[in-house]
Amino acid sequence: MSEKKNKKERLADEIEQEELNILDETEETVEEEAAADTLTEEQAKILELENKLDEVENRYLRMQADFENVKKRHIADRDASQKYRSQSLAQDLLPALDSFEKALATTSDQEEVKQILKGMEMVYNQILVAFEKEGIEVIPAVGEQFDPNFHQAVMQDSDENAGSNEITAELQKGYKLKDRVIRPSMVKVNQ
C-alpha cells in the first residue's frame, strides 16, 4: 500500500509540477504578448509621429515657397511702381504741352510776340528734356505703319503716295513711358 501511496504522491507531484510548468509557460506567453503589444503600440506611435513630422515639413516648405512668391511679387510691384512713378504727372502735363505746341505754331511779325514765343519754346524744350530723363518719349507717327497699340485712327486718307495702312498725318502727339502708352497718337491713316 505504501507503494500505491508513493505512486499516487509521485503522480500528484508530477501533475502539480506539470501544472506549474504550464502556468509558467502561460505567464511567459502572456508577458511576450504584452511585450509584443507594447512594441507594436510603440511602433504605431513612432509611425504616427513620423507622419506628423512629414506633414509639418511639407507645410513648412509650402509656406516658405509662398513667402518667396509674395516677396518676388512685392519686389516686382515696387519696381513697376518706381518705373512708372512719373506717369500720373506726365498725364497731367500733356494738355499743357499740347497748348505750348499750339502757341508755338502761331507766327507773328511783332518783335515782342517773337520774344514771348522764343521763351515759350525754351520752356517747352525743358519740359521735353525732363520727360526724356524720366523715360517719357513721343510715339513716332507720320510715315509709320498704323499700330493700334500706339495709335488711334480718327480719320482715313486716300493718298496714292503713301502705302496702305500708313499714317499720313498726326492730329495729336502720343506719348509712352518706357514700354507703357500714356496717350496714343491721334492719327490719319491711309487706306
UniProtKB/Swiss-Prot annotation:
Participates actively in the response to hyperosmotic and heat shock by preventing the aggregation of stress-denatured proteins, in association with DnaK and GrpE. It is the nucleotide exchange factor for DnaK and may function as a thermosensor. Unfolded proteins bind initially to DnaJ; upon interaction with the DnaJ-bound protein, DnaK hydrolyzes its bound ATP, resulting in the formation of a stable complex. GrpE releases ADP from DnaK; ATP binding to DnaK triggers the release of the substrate protein, thus completing the reaction cycle. PANTHER family: GRPE PROTEIN (PTHR21237), GRPE PROTEIN HOMOLOG, MITOCHONDRIAL (PTHR21237:SF23). Homodimer. Belongs to the GrpE family. The keyword Chaperone applies. Keywords: Chaperone, Cytoplasm, Stress response. One of its GO terms (biological process) is protein folding. Disulfide bonds: none annotated. It comes from Listeria monocytogenes serotype 4b (strain CLIP80459). It comes from the Bacteria. The gene is grpE. HAMAP family: GrpE (MF_01151). One of its GO terms (molecular function) is unfolded protein binding. Pfam families: GrpE. InterPro entries: GrpE, GrpE_coiled_coil, GrpE_head. It is found in: Cytoplasm. GO terms for cellular component: cytoplasm. This is Protein GrpE.
